[in-house]
Amino acid sequence: MDTIIYKQDLATPAQLLKSGQVVAFPTETVYGLGANALDKEAVKQVFAVKGRPSDNPLIVHVESFEQAKKYIQTLHPLAEKIVQQFWPGPLTLIFEIIPGSLPQEVTGGLTTAAFRMPNAKLTLDLIHQAGVPLVGPSANTSGKPSPTCAAHVYHDLQGKIAGIVDGGNCQVGVESTVLDLSNPKAAPMILRPGAITREMLADFLGIEILLDKHLVKESETPKSPGMKYKHYSPNTPVMMVQPENLAKAVADLKAQGKKLGLLASPKQLVGLNAELVLAYEDESVEAATKGLFAGLRALDEQDLDLILVTTTAETGLGQAYMNRLKKAAAQKIYEV
């Protein structure tokens, strides 16, 4: 199968999606692997292409809240308010759905489903032209760093999917926040941190927002992507390091003969020497979050023994950054 890159033409990829093909598309978070969410055979292809476990539910991408409502059984009393403030955007909402309205391949066999309206005009136009909602897990081989440009998708999935809609680089760089609204009588709970932070939601709604940190058991079906399976890991081992320990870590590991790649902010890298050094765009957590997956992919293409990545405080957007970094590093951190 030839994988075609589309830059302006949306009619062709929309037709491919209508006919049950798999097409990757851009969003503000990461690139998604698109298929008709109402076509279970198309959805099965997404799992096969990614090598994704079948009990890991998929997010349904819609062009409007009205489109999502066709499948939702019960609306949380805060749903409309949240949607008006944060959609389109990097926020996924989980609702109880009308039984049988979506294939169980989409829901992981649960009575709930996750919906998002991406803040990407190209993708909203694609959904509109396809005429159906689209599933859209990250368009990469399962377990690897998520793709933030079309080249990342092509690297992982060329020859396996019909096409890629190229919308340039993703602006956020990590997957959406997932907020559970499935119980109308319960307070909203974050199941996966992202760019819409716990603090943003709490400030807007005037209530405490909980963050679900429990580890999903092997026998349990996760309610949201990102809760159960190993994610975001390059082939080269990754180790976290606190910024103040970076220089010592480099010296110690180089003394052991390790070939190192470093991923950190420009100031953190001043004066350090390693086989390959990659800096985020600036010192902000936004830059670190945007550059994390792309940096891991770039360093993984080199002949390195270890990738060192600096940590940040787990507040605001730092929660999303550290959530992905901890998984990429399998929780390993350099100890002084």
Spans of features found by a protein language model:
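Active-site-adjacent structural elements in enzyme catalytic cores
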Residues: M1-V336
